[in-house]
Amino acid sequence: PFGFKELEGIHSRTDFDLGNHQKFSGKKIQYFDPEVGENYVPYVVETSIGVDRMFLAVLSHSYKEEQLENGETRVVLGIPAPLAPVKVAVLPLIKKDGLPELAREIMDDLKYDFNCQYDEKDSIGKRYRRQDAIGTPFCVTIDHDSLNDRCVTVRHRDTMEQQRVKIEDLHSIISKEVNLSNIL
């Protein structure tokens, strides 16, 4: 969105820097190559990259506005799950009937390993949209069935697909998805 900007500078300095250092210091800075039997001053490739520009590039690339079937616009920060600041949101369907209590139990289990948010304000759809906009890859919804079957609904930010999973499996599912090795 900002036009063409340099993210990383790569400069072939050839032997200029080391050659001048050798010239003015009076010290030989050479490498002996045994395969060809010669000494030479090595070439230098200089790179420079700024974290702020890299971060801006990731954010700019991740921001999307999607048109939904109902005509509304969905704002999504589709940052890769391992890089997302908030990994999971815990959302009780309503603020009564024991759902917030179970949601807090789940939050307490997850919060030591993942940056989590708890939200019970507004409708579940509005809460999903808020989490989409800040880049939260997973929303865990606790509903009335959760009290009986000990399962929750996990909603994936990018696809909006939902799946029922056992509460006991939740931690390992999220761990697997937010593992940094997924993007390396």
Predicted segments, located by residue:
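NTP/phosphate- and nucleic-acid-binding module
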Residues: 1-184
